């Protein structure tokens, strides 16, 4: 346990940030999974809507500093590629 007052405060803020980032990453994984399920089911309209929603969530995560912009771009690109491979 830290003895310095500022370090005790940082422990609290770091824990809050960790939980916030964990919630954001969890939401990203959920949206990605929903998208992949729709693609596997062959629902093109649903997959397109889910792709837009997931892309928006990735952009929000970048804005909040949870993900690096290149990481989000890579994930969005992979999802778009999967969507475009649907017949």
From Swiss-Prot:
Disordered: annotated span: 1-25
UniProt key word RNA-binding: yes
UniProt keyword Ribosomal protein, yes or no: yes
GO cellular component, one term: small ribosomal subunit
InterPro entries listed in its UniProt record: Ribosomal_bS20 (IPR002583), Ribosomal_bS20_sf (IPR036510)
Keywords: Ribonucleoprotein, Ribosomal protein, RNA-binding, rRNA-binding
SUPFAM superfamilies in the cross-refs: Ribosomal protein S20
Pfam family name, one: Ribosomal_S20p
Gene Ontology MF terms in the entry: small ribosomal subunit rRNA binding; structural constituent of ribosome
Biological-process GO terms, alphabetical: translation
Biased composition (Basic residues): 1-11
Signal peptide positions on this chain: none
The protein's role, per its UniProt record: Binds directly to 16S ribosomal RNA.
Family classification: Belongs to the bacterial ribosomal protein bS20 family.
HAMAP family recorded: Ribosomal_bS20
Protein name: Small ribosomal subunit protein bS20
Lineage summary: Bacteria, Bacillati, Actinomycetota, Actinomycetes, Mycobacteriales
Gene that this polypeptide is encoded by: rpsT
